[in-house]
Structure formats: structure tokens, C-alpha cells
């Protein structure tokens, strides 16, 4: 799968693999951003795990799926959200209150919007998953 946006391609590949029932998916090329988002997915229970495989180029991630993702995708353009503004973006991208996760990049790293709200930091919304 090639294109201009490896991040969007990775989320699309996960979405497609989940919809047809695959238990594993290879995501390439690998990047720190994709790895951090996969870590959030793992922490929130959407995937069983992932590992980095060095293929001599950019590398790739082997993702173990568990059928918990109904939909995931990138947020384009990347909207800025203050620590008290996440509810607005939850209403826009998630199907119900407290169902799903927004992935946010902050000055403290990439994390879920729940963690960002607890820490009282804002950032840019880069992805969603439910």
C-alpha cells in the first residue's frame, strides 16, 4: 500500500484488516508516530500487541488484532484542542459519550484524550478509534 500519508495508510490497513476478520496485519513503513499510536491502541485494549520488524529499510510493525476496532482513522486537518475542549471533538469523531478514544499529540507525548484530560494538557487531535 503506497500513498502520500503513511500514517493514514497504517490506520486504513488496520481498519480494513479488522473488517475482514484478520488476526494479524503488517503496517509499513514504520515510524515513531505510528508506534506511539499503536501503543495507545494497546493501552486502551483495541489490539493484542505489536512488534517492530527491521526489514533493512524503514521497518514495519506486526500488529496482533483482536476484533475490537469498529473504526479507526486519522483526523485531517489536525485540530488543536485545549485541555477542556475534548468533549467537542468527542462529539464530532466518536459515536457516543465515553465510547472510543481520541489520540492526541501533546507536549508530553502522544496519548489518549483521557490521559491528556487527567494531566490537564491540550494538544492536537491526530486520530480516533472505537
Swiss-Prot record:
Gene3D superfamilies attached to this UniProt entry: 3.30.1370.30, 3.30.1490.10
Any one cellular-component term (Gene Ontology): ribonucleoprotein complex
Keyword RNA-binding: yes
InterPro entries: Ribosomal_uS8, Ribosomal_uS8_CS, Ribosomal_uS8_sf
Keywords: Ribonucleoprotein, Ribosomal protein, RNA-binding, rRNA-binding
Keyword rRNA-binding belongs to the record: yes
Gene Ontology terms for molecular function: rRNA binding; structural constituent of ribosome
Protein family membership: Belongs to the universal ribosomal protein uS8 family.
Stated role: One of the primary rRNA binding proteins, it binds directly to 16S rRNA central domain where it helps coordinate assembly of the platform of the 30S subunit.
Name of the featured protein: Small ribosomal subunit protein uS8
Amino acid at each position: 500500500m503506497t500513498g502520500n500519508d503513511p500514517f493514514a495508510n497504517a490506520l486504513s490497513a488496520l481498519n480494513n484488516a479488522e473488517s475482514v476478520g484478520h488476526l494479524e496485519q503488517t503496517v509499513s513503513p514504520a515510524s515513531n508516530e505510528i508506534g506511539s499510536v499503536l501503543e495507545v491502541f494497546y493501552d486502551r485494549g483495541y489490539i493484542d500487541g505489536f512488534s517492530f520488524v527491521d526489514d533493512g529499510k524503514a521497518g514495519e510493525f506486526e500488529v496482533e488484532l483482536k476484533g475490537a476496532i469498529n473504526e479507526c482513522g486519522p483526523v485531517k486537518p489536525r485540530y488543536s484542542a485545549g485541555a477542556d475542549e475534548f468533549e467537542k471533538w468527542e462529539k464530532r469523531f466518536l459515536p457516543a459519550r465515553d465510547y472510543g478514544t481520541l489520540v492526541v499529540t501533546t507536549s508530553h507525548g502522544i496519548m489518549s484524550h483521557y490521559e491528556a484530560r487527567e494531566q490537564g494538557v491540550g494538544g492536537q487531535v491526530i486520530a480516533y478509534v472505537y
